[in-house]
Regions:
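C-terminal extensions
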Residues: 1-98, 102-112, 119-122
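Conserved DEDDh/DEDDy metal-dependent 3′-5′ exonuclease domain
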Residues: 98, 108-203
């Protein structure tokens, strides 16, 4: 849509005049894209951190949809690799962080897999670990970044026909919280993407 409107480079977008409308693109989205382009062409901060702007707080977007903090909250990540010959996916690492009850330090826990059978076992062990923690912290949330984790969980429970009822319940009650839309709804980042590797430069 931008190219159709004659905008071919990031500089074109950054210099776009106010009030211009582009067919098929919401004004809010165009404004965010323009602000992001302006930040990207601007020299980076001396400390190497990307430029960013805080968005206006709007109910139902950004930080306003962040759940209330719970002592049992979990930060969750999956790492997978695709077999180039068979085209199959293997989630070789299920990792998570949670708070130490005694001093609030972060504890990292991982389940590794090197084969489909180990992948199934790792998935089942992870689900059971979360279920055990839910008994102690029924209001906890599982935070992840992007849609990959939720999609992979669905694939694993369907592929191995295991833990379907539990996963369905998790999804029905929004146990998993995707932080990506919360981030994109809260800031405009002067980077080419909102990948976690780009966003973490702010910290």
């Amino acid at each position: 849509k931008l190219k159709e409107a004659g905008i071919h480079t990031i500089d074109d977008l950054a210099q776009l005049k106010e009030g211009i409308k582009i067919q098929g693109l919401r004004q809010e989205a165009l404004h965010d894209l323009k602000e992001q382009a302006k930040l990207q062409v601007k020299p980076k901060c001396p400390d190497g951190k990307p430029n960013y702007l805080l968005k206006k707080i709007i109910e139902g977007k950004g930080l306003t949809i962040l759940p209330k903090q719970n002592q049992g909250d979990i930060w969750f990540d999956l790492e997978g690799v695709q077999n180039p010959v068979f085209g199959t996916q293997l989630e070789y690492l299920i990792g998570l962080c949670y708070k130490n009850e005694s001093d609030d330090s972060c504890i990292y826990k991982a389940w590794w897999a090197h084969s489909p059978s180990e992948e199934k076992q790792a998935f089942e062990n992870w689900v059971q670990w979360v279920e055990n923690r839910l008994k102690r912290y029924p209001d906890l949330k599982i935070y992840h970044y992007g849609s990959y984790e939720k999609t992979a969980i669905r694939r694993l429970e369907q592929q191995y026909s295991t833990k379907e009822t539990i996963i369905d319940q998790w999804l029905r009650y929004s146990l998993l919280v995707d932080l990506l839309p919360i981030v994109t709804g809260s800031i405009v980042l002067g980077e080419e993407s909102y990948s976690i590797k780009k966003v973490e430069k702010l910290y």
